[in-house]
Amino acid sequence: MNTAVTLLTEQAPQPIEEFGQLERQIIIILDFGSQYSELIARRIRETQVYSEVLSYRTSAEHLRQLNPKGIILSGGPSSVYSDRAPHCDPEIWNLGVPILGVCYGMQLMVNQLGGEVAKADRGEYGKASLHIDDPTDLLTNVEDGTTMWMSHGDSVTKMPPGFEVLAHTDNTPCAAVADHDKKLYGVQFHPEVVHSIGGLALIRNFVYHICECEPTWTTAAFVEEAIREVRAKVGDKRVLLALSGGVDSSTLAFLMHKAIGDQLTCVFIDQGFMRKYEPERLVKLFQEQFHIPVEYVNARDRFLDIMVGVTDPEEKRRRIGHEFIQVFEETSRNLGPFDYLAQGTLYPDVIESADTNVDPQTGERVAVKIKSHHNVGGLPKDLRFKLVEPLRKLFKDEVRKVGRSVGLPEEIVQRQPFPGPGLAIRILGEVTADRLNILRDADLIVRQEINQRGLYNEYWQAFAVLLPIRSVGVMGDQRTYAYPIVLRIVKSEDGMTADWARVPYDVLEAISNRIVNEVKGVNRVVFDITSKPPGTIEWE
């Protein structure tokens, strides 16, 4: 159960102002609504240079104050000649900072600087071969004919003054353009996606050769600075942390404990919807192996009671979230008082919701409402904490690196995503103690068989689902009428899209045989071969 909490917000993304030494060299991405904006930031960070995603509305003056080494304009779904198309502050062209426009960002650059963009005779979507006309500067070490990913219905029809074509495709005469003197560059393709074979080389050229950045954004340096900042902020005050056993909250707990030791209190609320043996193993690991005290709260009966008669998945989430808040409130009052709440806020949370609740006297962010992956409600108004969020600059893959760096074992670092409501939303229909036991046993077999064959890290998620129906079967000479189990095993890079995994038949056979023979109440196993989209990874 992921109980790491994040602020509920509704405003546009704002920059993280409290830059440390690591972020002095920064590449800013202005977001025009692209589904790939976060991916651009991740690709920049993979080059060991810090990056942030800001709204396209960010003023040139604000950007000047941030002093970026470079700016990237993201793609987007609009046409630059549309009346409602988003435009950036035209003064950014006078900042004297290298700028790279990607897809819509390139078209916007061309449009605002005196060129022309129009609807293309033929749109270009998917893979395309890039023919390089100028192999220097931005396209250094990018092979001629390399594959790049296109997704556009508009094209540049007239170049702005001072620009020249760097590359073209069979359908796009201006696939890459540049004004070398002003260090303004544009590409019609998406170098950030994995399908663009030469994309990373292009990004590295922009970051290192054009923006002249240095590789300062490293895991070791981040950990050192985060510990220093936590100590400076918290001082000798007490900090409360909600532990779930997932990689985010576990990494947070390790980092906080390294920084402040026994000033940290970890609370694990067992709501009864975790996988078999997980609660006991988690508490034992933290207390005996990691020597981090954990306050264990057994709330299984309370959560099971509120599930009686509930079949709607959203109602399940609402009730679980509400009850979690009640238990969390009671526990914090019993163990308190606390000055700070340690949150596992990650950078995507900051991008999606950048509103802040600020204490007018101290200027610090305070937790008035919290949000978890099971959509919990707000904390009571009189239960106010100041926030400490050492992971809020990180993407998920960076959290895993930090986890390894601070000593988190690989079994937690590589733990597959698990929904906040846990098994409650992998049981379709009403959640009962009997159904929970059936699903726990079946799910354990799935994980055991996958693990034994060294396949665990091959899949984004691998789990069992219990359906609220029964089917006829035969075992021995007896007719059976029992539940079916669904196997859901998928591959994905980020969970936004997913493909059903081509699991070897012998593995599927072993899982099926064990479940129907070892799990009482199950007589059939089926395999879900639906990708996302159109389906979702979870069934509820």
Swiss-Prot record:
Cross-referenced InterPro entries: Class_I_gatase-like, GATASE, GMP_synth_C, GMP_synth_GATase, GMP_synthase, GMPS_ATP_PPase_dom, NAD/GMP_synthase, Rossmann-like_a/b/a_fold
Domain GMPS ATP-PPase: 217-415
GO molecular function terms attached to this record: ATP binding; GMP synthase activity
EC number in record: 6.3.5.2
Pathway: Purine metabolism; GMP biosynthesis; GMP from XMP (L-Gln route): step 1/1
Pfam families listed in its UniProt record: GATase (PF00117), GMP_synt_C (PF00958), NAD_synthase (PF02540)
Active site positions, chain numbering: 103, 190, 192
Keyword field contains Kinase: no
Keywords on record: ATP-binding, Glutamine amidotransferase, GMP biosynthesis, Ligase, Nucleotide-binding, Purine biosynthesis
UniProt catalytic activity: XMP + L-glutamine + ATP + H2O = GMP + L-glutamate + AMP + diphosphate + 2 H(+)
Annotated CDD domains: GATase1_GMP_Synthase, GMP_synthase_C
Biological function: Catalyzes the synthesis of GMP from XMP.
Subunit structure, interactors included: Homodimer.
Full protein name: GMP synthase [glutamine-hydrolyzing]
